[in-house]
From Swiss-Prot:
Belongs to the ACC deaminase/D-cysteine desulfhydrase family. InterPro entries: ACCD_DCysDesulf, ACP_carboxylate_deaminase, ACP_carboxylate_deaminase_bac, TrpB-like_PALP, TrpB-like_PALP_sf. The keyword Cell membrane does not apply. Its EC number is 3.5.99.7. It holds the Pfam family PALP. Catalyzes a cyclopropane ring-opening reaction, the irreversible conversion of 1-aminocyclopropane-1-carboxylate (ACC) to ammonia and alpha-ketobutyrate. Allows growth on ACC as a nitrogen source. The active site is at residue 78. Homotrimer. CDD domains: ACCD. Keywords: Hydrolase, Pyridoxal phosphate. This is 1-aminocyclopropane-1-carboxylate deaminase. GO terms for molecular function: 1-aminocyclopropane-1-carboxylate deaminase activity; D-cysteine desulfhydrase activity; pyridoxal phosphate binding. It comes from Burkholderia orbicola (strain MC0-3).
Length: 338
C-alpha cells in the first residue's frame, strides 16, 4: 500500500490520542473494553474533526490548481462546512458554503448558532438553500461554483463530506496506518472499530486501510443517514476507488463493507430516544460529548451492540469519535435540562 505518494498539507496536531473509556465499559458489564480515538481533538482549526484529516489531502491539490476559493456544501449545522471555512481562513483563501435544509428540526436559533455561526465568524460566504437532504452531488453547489467563476474567482470543489472528491478517502487510510502504529505501542490490536457513516468516505478510507492487515470487515459502520442503501453503495464505490489509488493490491468486495442500519432513525439529523440516552450516558460517565446527528448515533450503536452481546467477551473496541459537538447548541431545546 502506498499512501505516501500523495502530498499531505498538515492541518492536524499529529496522531490523535486513544482514550480508554473505563467507566462506560464498566457500566456496560466490563466484558468488552471500549476505547475512543479522538478525531474531535485533532486540530486547532475551529475544533477540527474528521473532515480536517481528509482536507489534508485535498489542500495540496487546491493549491496546485491555483484555486482562490474553497466551495463546499452541507446541512445548516454541517461540521464539514465549518472545517472547510477554518481551512480557508488558515490558508488565506475565500470560502463559499452552501447550507441546505437537511434536517427537519425547527428551532428559532438553529441557523444562528453552532457550526454555521462559527463559519460566519471565520468569514465564509454562507448561502442558505431550502433543498432537502441528499448525499450526492447537488445543483446548488454547482451553481455556487459557477457564481465564483462569474465573479472572476477560481473555485475548488469540495463535495459533502469530501466524499465524492477523488482524494476523499485518503485521510482515513492514514487513520488506519496511525492506529496500527499506536497498537504497536499499546501491545494489542483492536478487534473492532466503530464509526459513523453518512456520505461514506470516512468508513471507505478505514476499510481500505484496515484491509492491508486483513481487518476490513472489522470496521463497523453505523449508518446515520437513514438512507442506508445509498450510503452503502457510496462507501463501497469510494473504497474501491481509494484502494486503486493507494495500490492496496486486492479488490474491495461487498463483504468488506459492514454497515449496521438499526440506528439511523427516525431520519437524518433527528435523534431517537436511544441516541439521546447514549449522548447523556457518555457525557455523564466519561465527560465526552457526542451530538444528535452523527456521533450520538454511532455511540448508541456501539452501546447497544455491547448490551446485545454482539462483541465477543474480551473484545477491544475502538470508537472513532469524528467530532460534531459544536452543533449541540443548535439542539438546545432537546438538551435544555441536560
Amino acid at each position: 500500500m502506498n499512501l505516501q505518494r500523495f502530498p499531505r498539507y498538515p492541518l492536524t496536531f499529529g496522531p490523535t490520542p486513544i482514550q480508554p473509556l473505563k467507566r462506560l465499559s464498566a457500566h456496560l458489564g466490563g466484558k468488552v473494553e471500549l476505547y475512543a480515538k479522538r478525531e474531535d481533538c485533532n486540530s486547532g482549526l475551529a475544533f477540527g474533526g474528521n473532515k480536517t484529516r481528509k482536507l489534508e489531502y485535498l489542500v495540496p491539490d487546491a493549491l496546485a490548481q491555483g484555486a482562490d476559493t474553497l466551495v463546499s456544501i452541507g446541512g445548516v449545522q454541517s461540521n464539514q462546512t465549518r472545517q472547510v471555512a477554518a481551512v480557508a481562513a488558515h490558508l488565506g483563501m475565500k470560502c463559499v458554503l452552501v447550507q441546505e435544509h437537511w434536517v427537519n428540526y425547527e428551532d428559532p436559533v438553529y441557523d444562528r448558532v453552532g457550526n454555521i455561526q462559527l463559519s460566519r465568524m471565520m468569514g465564509a460566504d454562507v448561502r442558505l438553500v431550502s433543498d432537502g437532504f441528499d448525499i450526492g452531488i447537488r445543483r446548488s453547489w454547482e451553481e455556487a461554483m459557477e457564481s465564483v467563476r462569474q465573479a472572476g474567482g477560481k473555485p475548488y470543489p469540495i463535495p459533502a463530506g469530501c466524499s465524492e472528491h477523488p482524494l476523499g478517502g485518503l485521510g482515513f487510510v492514514g487513520f488506519a496506518e496511525e492506529v496500527r502504529a499506536q497498537e504497536a505501542q499499546l501491545g494489542f490490536k483492536f478487534d473492532y472499530v466503530v464509526v459513523c457513516s453518512v456520505t461514506g468516505s470516512t468508513q471507505a478510507g478505514m476499510v481500505v486501510g484496515f484491509a492491508a492487515d486483513g481487518r476490513a470487515d472489522r470496521v463497523i459502520g453505523i449508518d446515520a443517514s437513514a438512507k442506508p442503501e445509498q450510503t452503502r453503495e457510496q462507501i463501497t464505490r469510494i473504497a474501491r476507488h481509494t484502494a486503486e489509488l493507494v495500490e492496496l493490491g486486492r479488490d474491495i468486495v461487498e463483504q468488506d463493507v459492514v454497515l449496521d442500519t438499526r440506528y439511523g432513525g427516525p431520519e437524518y439529523g433527528l435523534p431517537s430516544d436511544g441516541t439521546l440516552e447514549a449522548i447523556r450516558l457518555c457525557a455523564r460517565l466519561e465527560g465526552m460529548l457526542t451530538d444528535p446527528v452523527y456521533e450520538g448515533k454511532s455511540m448508541h450503536g456501539m452501546i447497544d451492540k455491547v448490551r446485545l452481546g454482539e462483541f465477543e467477551p474480551g473484545s477491544k473496541v475502538l470508537y472513532a469519535h469524528l467530532g460534531g459537538a459544536p452543533a449541540l447548541s443548535a439542539y438546545n431545546g432537546i438538551f435544555r435540562n441536560g
